[in-house]
């Protein structure tokens, strides 16, 4: 999200003293300057940056550091609090008690609006056991209608469309259909444009006045620049938005402009999309995003995702086998399947706490490596995955797997070598646990 973690700037530029002391202006001048540069580089709006720096300075200058307090952690806590305030302070969840709940989705072309509409329907279905209806109102792009229908079928959600018929008439008919079929969440996927224009605004107004939506959500691409602020301001002026959904936060986008919207327009970000998978939509928690910007990770969201998508029994079984030294390639394949459910390597990495940035190239390399391994593992028989020693006894099996997977012999050799190392390491950790020793001591934990 940001090229430099703010916590690393504090470590590098904050002038700390050893004894009890009061933080002075000169102690934070350089660190605030570097934070300002980082925020601007991330495309955070200038007015937002000025307000943020001013608020941090007011909170920190004159702060007395008591004996036993870590001044660095004091400053980080103040920065986190002010970042959280800028981002909206508290999560803004949609009230699902309304029946039916009507949501109008708007956005420019390419923002991910149609995919996000399907993700939102899937979210309400799985999280609240609702019966959603997806309505295609983008009559100018037949491909958008087809896309929404395909996504609806993929997650078994009801779909309504009337081709190129006037979208206001279609919206009205959809309401009747929803009533007849007892749909309790109605999502209108409206037309997108390359830019906001009078014709589009008039159409959206007419739809809004007919369906009286409970939520009007503007879908924003995280890769958008400062112009998105003008777009959001214009839509809000005419339609009275209730919030935003930011998409593509799993990309290497700076996202600063999108994250500036709440402070500038006093409207909440309701959800974020962090992947292409239909389940990759999360409630926007300002404090958790502040942690990511600081470099503290977002373990809570990662744990929640794991609880939602991972098969607990399979995960426990594989882990138990690993710790007693019985890990085989079938276990490895199962663990990789489970990991894939959490999202891309990049998505997971960005939720882990660290003060050094893994380059996007390294993350893509890891993603590609995992895909190659999955291809080779699926080219093996169950016997080969359960007993990889057969590759040494019968080398012809390697030739078959290499040909079947379309990979090179070296790729298979690397897979087998790294699996052997991982098996040995997990077995060592299991023995340490068995004898009451800390298996993570070797990592300084």
Regions found by a protein language model. Name each.
Residues 1-106, 119-120, 126-136, 154-155, ...:
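Non-catalytic terminal/linker segments enriched in charged/polar, low-complexity residues
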Residues 24, 65-66, 70, 109, ...:
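Flexible beta-alpha connector loops of hexameric P-loop NTPases
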Residues 46, 141, 145-149, 229, ...:
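Short, surface-exposed alpha-helical segments at coil->helix boundaries
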Residues 106-107, 189, 219, 273:
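Short beta-strand segments
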Residues 113:
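Conserved lysine of the Walker
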Residues 132-144, 154-211:
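Switch II (G3) loop of P-loop NTPases
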Residues 171-174, 183, 195, 199-209, ...:
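Conserved phosphate-handling catalytic cores of large alpha/beta enzymes
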């Amino acid at each position: 999200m940001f090229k430099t973690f703010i916590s690393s700037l504090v470590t590098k530029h904050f002038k700390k003293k050893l004894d009890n002391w009061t933080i002075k202006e000169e102690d934070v001048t350089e660190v605030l300057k570097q934070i300002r540069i980082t925020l601007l580089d991330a495309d955070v709006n200038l007015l937002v940056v000025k307000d943020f720096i001013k608020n941090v300075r007011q909170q920190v200058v004159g702060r007395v550091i008591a004996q036993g307090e870590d001044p660095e952690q004091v400053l980080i806590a103040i920065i986190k609090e002010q970042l959280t305030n800028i981002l909206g302070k508290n999560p803004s969840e949609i009230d699902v008690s309304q029946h039916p709940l009507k949501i109008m989705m708007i956005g420019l072309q390419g923002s991910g609006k149609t995919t996000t509409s399907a993700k939102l329907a899937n979210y309400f279905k799985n999280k609240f056991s609702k019966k959603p209806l997806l309505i295609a109102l983008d009559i100018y792009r037949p491909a958008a209608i087809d896309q929404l229908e395909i996504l609806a079928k993929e997650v078994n959600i009801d779909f309504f469309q009337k081709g190129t018929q006037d979208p206001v008439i279609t919206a009205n008919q959809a309401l009747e259909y929803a009533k007849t079929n007892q749909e309790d969440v109605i999502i209108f996927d409206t037309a997108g444009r390359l830019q906001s224009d009078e014709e589009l605004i008039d159409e959206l107004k007419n739809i809004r006045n007919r369906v009286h939506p409970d939520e009007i959500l503007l879908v924003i691409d995280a890769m958008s620049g400062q112009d998105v602020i003008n777009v959001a301001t214009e839509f809000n002026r005419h339609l009275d938005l209730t919030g935003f959904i930011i998409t593509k936060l799993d990309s290497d986008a700076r996202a600063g402009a999108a994250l500036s919207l709440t402070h500038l327009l006093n409207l909440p970000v309701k959800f974020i999309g962090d992947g292409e998978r239909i389940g990759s939509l999360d409630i926007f928690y300002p404090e958790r995003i502040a942690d990511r910007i600081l470099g503290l990770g977002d373990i809570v969201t990662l744990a929640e995702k794991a609880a939602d998508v991972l098969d607990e029994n399979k995960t426990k079984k594989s882990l138990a086998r690993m710790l007693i030294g019985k890990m085989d390639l079938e276990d490895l394949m199962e663990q990789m399947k489970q990991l894939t459910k959490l999202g891309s390597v990049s998505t997971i990495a960005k939720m882990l706490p660290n003060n050094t940035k893994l380059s996007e190239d390294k993350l893509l390399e890891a993603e590609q490596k995992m895909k190659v391994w999955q291809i080779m593992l699926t080219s093996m028989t169950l016997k080969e995955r359960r007993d990889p020693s057969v590759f040494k006894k019968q080398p012809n099996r390697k030739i078959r797997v290499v040909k079947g997977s379309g990979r090179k012999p070296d790729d298979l050799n690397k897979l087998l070598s790294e699996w052997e190392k991982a098996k040995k390491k997990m077995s060592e950790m299991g023995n340490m646990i068995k004898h009451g020793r800390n298996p993570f001591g070797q990592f300084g934990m």
